[in-house]
Amino acid sequence: MKQMLEKAKELVKMLQAAVDEEQQVQLSTLKPRDKFTTDIGEFIVLEQLEGQTKVITAKLFKENVRFDDSSTDYKKSELKKLCDTEILQEFEKVFETDNIVEHAADLTTLDGQKAFGTVVCKVRPLTFDEVRKYTEILSDKELPDWYWTCTAWSTKERGWEYSVAVVGPSGNVSDDVCGSQYGVRPFCILKSNIFVSKGE
């Protein structure tokens, strides 16, 4: 009886592996809006580039996270430290380190100031310009909370020392102080020749 049970378990495992393999597709074949599943949640394709794919988590990856105690400069923020350590490590376990592309992001403020320059990283929140570009894809009224961008609203010199742009579930954008707590919906760029499990 015990042997039969073990054989049944082994058969179930083999069938599951076959199903998983059948659902595997090359990331480059997915279109914007398409979803794929991983051990850490579902991702949405935002854009296909030559050999690379821009993706974002379908849901909030973390909740109740502070941007920073006093800075709206993403490069100096607590949120960047979280993305560069804990979140990146979780992504690397799923996609492998070499498949996550390091890239530069423009930290121009919402009102067009260049005070914060650019940031180079692998995993981060979207910028305001990216939120605007992908707004039709990002909207999800089922999200439980707003989420951070890495874009400051303005600067101290213009009277906005602590404000950062945040995105609502329906895609609307507002500002709040950096010390508030919101969700994190990480963005990254992956090599598009990897294989993923296509979602429904």
Where in this protein do the model-derived segments appear?
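Short amphipathic alpha-helical heptad-repeat segments
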Residues: 1-5
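Collagenous Gly-X-Y triple-helix signature in extracellular proteins
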Residues: 6-200
